[in-house]
C-alpha cells in the first residue's frame, strides 16, 4: 500500500476516474445553491441531485469530484471518536444512466488494489452487500475477492424518501488484531459493532429503483436511468494510507494540532486525553471553510451552527489554558493544508480571520453573561433549599450561552450542588431528534420524469429578438408526448425561441404564440429548462397546435424591458456593494421581476443608512454615466482573465457569457440585459433587511417604479410638513425635532411630578407597619398611573429603614399590578409573589430583592393583602 499525502490521495482519485472517461466536477460551495432542503452541502452527491432525479441531463454522464462537506447532527461526538468530523471531504465517482454495477465494482477494486494506483493489499479488504443483491456478490468474486471477505448486511439498502434508491456495497480495511482486543473478528462487521479494526473507506450505491413510500420495497419500479453514486472519505483514506491511529494524526489535522500546542504550551498525546486538541482542529476547519463560502456566525440556521462550533472550540481552548482569542490565528494553517485544491481559504484569509476574531471577542463577553446566569440559578437553588441544578437549566446554559456541560458541572459542584445529567440528556435528545427529523424531511431527491428526460430535440434561445418564426418540435400534454393538442395546458419545445427560460434569478418571459393567420393559438405563462437544457414553454392552449408546424413566437416586450432594467441594475448594485461595504458582500441569491429586484448578499451586520445612501448614489451615477453594455461568449478561464465575477456555487459550461457594463462591472451571466445603463432611468432602494445569519437582503426598484417610490416619499413628507406647520418641506425635519424635544421635556416633567406625588403618598403608606413571623412588613393598595410608579415607591422605601418587606398592589385599568420588595435574606421576593399572584388571577416572579406580577381580578385585592403575613 502506498503511503501518500492527503493531496496526493485526492489527486490520484481524480486522475484515476478521469482515465475512465469521467469529468471532474469542481467542489461546490458549502452553502447550498437553490436547495432549501439542505442546511449545508453534506455529501458528494448533494450537489448532483438535479442529475440523479433527471431534472437536468449532464454533458458527460460520468462524473468524479472531491467535495467539501459539513454535517453537524452529532457535534458532541467530535473529539471523542477517531473518525467523527463536522467538516470532511468526500471523494466520489458517479454514473448518470451510463455504466452500472459491473464497472463500478471492477474499477473501484482496480483503484484500490492496482500497484499503479493505491496498491492496497487485497487480503486486508472486506466488503458488505445487500443479501438480495447477488449480482454484487458475484462481481466481487469475479474480481478475485475471497467469499470469506464478503459479508451480507440487511441494512445495505440506500433510500431517503421518494426518489432514486438501491442496494449498496461497502468496502472496509482491516487494521488487524491489534485493534480488536476482544478478538471478535468479522462479527464486528456482521453485527455492526462499533470498532477500530474494520474501517469503512468507501460506499458504492447502486441506484436502480424509484423508491415509493406507498409500496413495499419489492414493488419499487426500476429507474429509467440507473445510476452509480459512491463516496469515500478522504480523512479515512488518509488515516489508513498514512498508518495513523485516528484521522486526527494525518497531515490534514496534525499541522493545526502542532499550532495549538504552541499556543497552549501543552503537548498532544495520541494515547492520552487529547479531546480538546481534536475539537479545536476539527472546528476551525469547518469555520474557515464555511465563512469563506459566505456563511457567518449568528443565532439561527447555519449561523447558529457556526457560533456553536466556535464557542465549543473556544471553551476547549480554555481547558488547554488558552484564555485569549486564538482561533483566528489557526486560519492560515488550515489554508496552507488545503491550498492545493481549495485556495479560497488563503484568498479570503483576512476576512475569515476578522470574523472569527470578532466572534471570539463577542463570546468572551457572553461567557461573563452566562456566568451571571449560572450564579442566579445557584442563588435561587439556595433560597429554595434545593441541592440539584435541573437538566433544563443546564441545557439552557449550553444552548443559549454556549456553556459546555463540563464547565457548568465544575462550577456547580464547586458551589456544592449536584447536576441533573438525565434531565440534560433528555433536553439534548429532544433537540437532536428535531434536527434529525428536519434532515430526513429534506433529504430525498425528486423522482425521475422519463418523459421530460427523453426530450432530445435541439432548441436554441435567441437573445436579440422579441419575435421569430419557428417550428414546433415537441408537445407534452398530461405528461405524455403527443403530435397535437387543442385545449388545456401543454409543454412545448420549438427549434428556436425568443422566450427566456427562468434562470440565474431572472424570471421567465411571457407572451403569445400565433399561427400563420396571425391568430393567437396559445398564451405562454412560464418557461423552464428541460433536463437536456431546452426551453420548455408552459402554455394555455387556445386553438389547435401540431408538431412540425411553424408558429410565430412573440414575447411581452414591455415586460422583458422592465425585467432587464432590474437585472442590469442588479449587476450595478453588486459592484457598488463591493466598493462600499467590501468584497465579501457576494451574491447569495437574486430575483429580477418586472416590478422590482431582490438581491441577497453575505454581510455580518445591517447596512447603515449612510452606506445605503452611498450605494444608491453610486448605482445612479453609473446609470447617468450612460455606460455601454456588451456581451461576450468565451471560456471560463478567459472570462476570469477579463475580471469577470463568477458566482460561487453556480455551474458553468465550456462556453460562458460575460456581461460587461462599461469598466464598472464584469460578471458571468446568462441573462438578458439592456444596451446602455442609461435605459434603467433611476434606481431606488426601498428596503434592507436580514434574512438569516450573515445574509442581508436589498429590495430595490428602477425606472417608473423608482420614480413612484420617490413621489410617495415626497407626498408623505408634504403631509408631515403640513401637520407640523412647516413653511417649506426643507423645514419639516427641524419642526418635527422641535416637537420631539418639547414632548420629551414634558414627559420628563410628568415623571418628576409623579415621583413627587409618590413620595408624598409614601409618607402615609410607609406608616402602616405590621409584623409576623418576626418580619416587619408593609402591605398596602396604592393609587398610581402605571407599574413604574410602584417601582418609585419601592425605591423610596429602600432609602430608609421602614420595614423588612414591602407589598404594594395597584388596580390600573382592568389589570392588577403587584410588587414585592425585600431587604431580608429570610424572605425571597420572587418566591413570595408566586404565592400571592394567583389570588388576583395572576402570575409573576423576580429576584430575591424585587419581584412583580400582573393579575386580572381586582375584586380580590383585599384578600391578597390579608394573605401577606402567611406568605412571609
Swiss-Prot record:
Describe the reaction catalysed, as an equation: tRNA(Ala) + L-alanine + ATP = L-alanyl-tRNA(Ala) + AMP + diphosphate
Q: Which SUPFAM superfamilies match?
A: Class II aaRS and biotin synthetases (SSF55681), Putative anticodon-binding domain of alanyl-tRNA synthetase (AlaRS) (SSF101353), ThrRS/AlaRS common domain (SSF55186), Translation proteins (SSF50447)
Task: State one molecular function term (GO).
Answer: ATP binding
Any keyword Transport? no
**Where do the annotations place Zn(2+) binding?**
567, 571, 669, 673
The UniProt entry, under InterPro entries, shows: aa-tRNA-synth_II/BPL/LPL (IPR045864), Ala-tRNA-lgiase_IIc (IPR002318), Ala-tRNA-ligase_IIc_anticod-bd (IPR018162), Ala-tRNA-synth_IIc_core (IPR018165), Ala-tRNA-synth_IIc_N (IPR018164), Ala-tRNA_ligase (IPR050058), Ala_tRNA_ligase_euk/bac (IPR023033), DHHA1_dom (IPR003156)
Query: Under what name is this protein listed?
Result: Alanine--tRNA ligase
Gene transcribed to yield this protein: alaS
Amino acid at each position: 500500500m502506498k503511503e501518500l499525502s492527503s493531496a496526493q490521495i485526492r489527486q490520484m482519485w481524480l486522475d484515476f476516474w478521469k482515465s475512465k472517461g469521467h469529468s471532474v466536477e469542481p467542489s461546490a460551495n458549502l452553502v447550498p445553491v437553490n436547495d432549501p432542503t439542505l442546511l449545508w452541502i453534506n455529501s458528494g452527491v448533494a450537489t448532483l441531485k438535479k442529475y440523479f432525479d433527471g431534472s437536468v441531463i449532464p454533458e458527460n454522464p460520468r462524473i468524479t469530484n472531491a467535495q467539501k462537506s459539513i454535517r453537524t447532527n452529532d457535534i458532541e461526538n467530535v473529539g471523542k471518536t477517531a473518525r467523527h468530523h463536522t467538516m470532511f471531504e468526500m471523494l466520489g465517482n458517479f454514473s448518470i444512466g451510463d455504466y452500472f454495477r459491473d464497472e463500478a465494482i471492477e474499477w473501484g477494486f482496480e483503484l484500490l488494489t492496482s500497484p499503479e494506483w493505491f496498491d492496497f493489499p487485497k487480503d486486508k479488504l472486506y466488503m458488505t452487500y445487500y443479501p438480495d443483491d447477488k449480482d454484487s456478490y458475484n462481481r466481487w468474486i469475479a474480481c478475485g475477492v475471497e467469499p470469506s471477505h464478503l459479508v451480507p448486511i440487511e441494512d445495505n439498502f440506500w433510500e431517503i424518501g421518494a426518489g432514486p434508491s438501491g442496494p449498496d456495497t461497502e468496502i472496509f480495511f482491516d487494521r488487524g488484531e491489534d485493534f480488536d482486543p476482544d478478538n471478535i473478528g468479522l462479527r464486528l462487521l456482521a453485527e455492526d459493532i462499533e470498532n477500530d479494526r474494520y474501517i469503512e473507506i468507501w460506499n458504492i450505491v447502486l441506484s436502480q429503483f424509484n423508491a415509493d413510500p406507498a409500496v413495499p420495497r419489492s414493488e419499487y419500479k426500476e429507474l429509467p436511468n440507473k445510476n452509480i453514486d459512491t463516496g469515500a472519505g478522504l480523512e479515512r483514506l488518509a488515516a489508513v494510507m498514512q498508518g495513523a491511529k485516528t484521522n486526527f494524526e494525518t497531515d490534514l489535522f496534525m499541522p493545526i494540532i502542532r499550532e495549538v500546542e504552541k499556543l497552549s504550551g501543552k503537548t498532544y498525546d495520541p494515547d492520552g486525553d487529547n479531546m480538546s486538541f481534536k475539537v479545536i482542529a476539527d472546528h476551525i476547519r469547518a469555520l474557515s471553510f464555511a465563512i469563506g463560502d459566505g456563511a457567518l456566525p449568528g443565532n439561527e440556521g447555519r449561523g447558529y451552527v457556526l457560533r456553536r462550533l466556535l464557542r465549543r472550540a473556544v471553551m476547549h481552548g480554555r481547558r488547554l489554558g488558552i484564555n485569549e482569542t486564538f482561533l483566528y490565528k489557526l486560519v492560515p494553517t488550515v489554508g496552507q493544508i488545503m491550498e492545493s485544491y481549495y485556495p479560497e481559504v488563503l484568498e479570503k484569509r483576512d476576512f475569515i480571520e476578522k470574523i472569527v476574531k470578532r466572534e471570539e471577542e463577542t463570546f468572551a463577553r457572553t461567557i461573563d453573561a452566562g456566568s451571571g446566569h449560572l450564579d442566579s440559578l445557584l442563588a435561587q437553588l439556595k433560597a429554595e433549599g434545593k441541592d440539584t441544578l435541573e437538566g433544563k437549566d443546564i441545557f439552557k446554559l449550553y444552548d443559549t450561552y454556549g456553556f459546555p456541560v463540563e464547565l457548568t458541572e465544575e462550577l456547580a459542584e464547586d458551589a456544592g450542588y449536584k447536576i441533573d445529567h438525565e434531565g440534560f440528556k433528555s433536553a439534548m435528545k429532544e433537540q437532536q431528534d428535531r434536527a434529525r427529523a428536519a434532515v430526513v424531511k429534506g433529504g430525498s431527491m425528486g423522482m425521475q420524469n422519463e418523459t421530460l428526460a427523453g426530450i432530445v430535440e435541439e432548441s436554441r434561445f435567441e437573445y436579440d429578438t422579441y419575435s421569430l418564426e419557428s417550428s414546433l418540435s415537441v408537445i407534452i400534454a398530461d405528461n405524455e408526448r403527443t403530435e397535437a393538442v387543442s385545449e388545456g395546458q401543454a409543454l412545448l419545445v420549438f427549434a428556436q425561441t425568443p422566450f427566456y427560460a427562468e434562470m440565474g434569478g431572472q424570471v421567465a418571459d411571457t407572451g403569445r404564440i400565433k399561427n400563420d393567420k396571425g391568430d393567437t393559438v396559445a398564451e405562454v405563462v412560464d418557461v423552464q429548462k428541460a433536463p437536456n437544457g431546452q426551453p420548455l414553454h408552459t402554455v394555455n392552449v387556445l386553438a389547435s397546435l401540431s408538431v412540425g408546424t411553424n408558429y410565430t413566437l412573440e414575447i411581452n416586450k414591455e415586460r422583458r424591458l422592465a425585467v432587464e432594467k432590474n437585472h442590469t441594475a442588479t449587476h450595478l448594485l453588486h459592484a457598488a456593494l463591493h466598493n462600499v461595504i467590501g468584497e465579501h458582500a457576494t451574491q447569495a441569491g437574486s430575483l429580477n421581476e418586472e416590478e422590482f429586484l431582490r438581491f441577497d448578499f453575505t454581510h455580518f451586520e445591517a447596512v447603515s443608512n449612510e452606506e445605503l445612501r452611498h450605494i444608491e448614489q453610486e448605482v445612479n451615477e453609473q446609470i447617468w454615466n450612460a455606460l455601454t453594455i456588451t456581451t461576450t461568449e468565451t471560456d471560463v478561464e478567459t472570462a476570469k482573465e477579463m475580471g469577470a465575477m463568477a458566482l460561487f456555487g453556480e455551474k458553468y459550461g465550456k462556453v460562458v457569457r460575460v456581461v460587461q457594463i462599461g469598466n464598472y462591472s464584469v460578471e458571468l451571466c446568462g441573462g438578458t440585459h439592456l444596451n446602455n445603463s442609461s435605459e434603467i432611468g433611476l434606481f431606488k432602494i426601498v428596503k434592507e433587511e436580514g434574512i438569516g445569519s450573515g445574509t442581508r437582503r436589498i429590495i430595490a426598484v428602477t425606472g417608473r417604479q423608482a420614480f413612484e417610490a420617490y413621489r410617495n416619499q415626497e407626498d408623505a413628507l408634504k403631509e408631515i410638513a403640513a401637520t407640523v406647520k412647516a413653511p417649506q418641506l426643507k423645514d419639516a425635519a427641524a419642526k418635527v425635532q422641535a416637537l420631539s424635544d418639547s414632548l420629551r421635556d414634558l414627559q420628563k416633567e410628568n415623571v418628576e411630578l409623579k415621583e413627587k406625588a409618590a413620595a408624598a403618598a409614601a409618607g402615609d403608606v410607609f406608616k402602616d407597619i405590621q409584623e409576623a413571623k418576626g418580619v416587619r412588613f408593609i402591605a398596602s393598595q396604592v393609587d398610581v398611573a402605571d407599574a413604574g410608579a410602584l417601582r418609585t415607591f419601592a425605591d423610596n422605601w429602600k432609602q430608609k429603614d421602614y420595614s423588612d418587606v414591602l407589598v404594594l398592589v395597584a388596580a390600573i385599568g382592568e389589570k392588577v399590578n403587584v410588587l414585592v420588595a425585600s431587604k431580608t435574606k429570610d424572605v425571597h421576593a420572587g418566591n413570595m409573589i408566586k404565592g400571592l399572584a394567583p389570588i388576583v388571577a395572576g402570575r409573576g416572579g423576580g429576584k430575591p430583592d424585587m419581584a412583580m406580577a400582573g393579575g386580572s381580578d381586582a375584586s380580590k385585592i383585599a384578600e391578597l393583602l390579608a394573605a401577606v403575613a402567611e406568605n412571609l
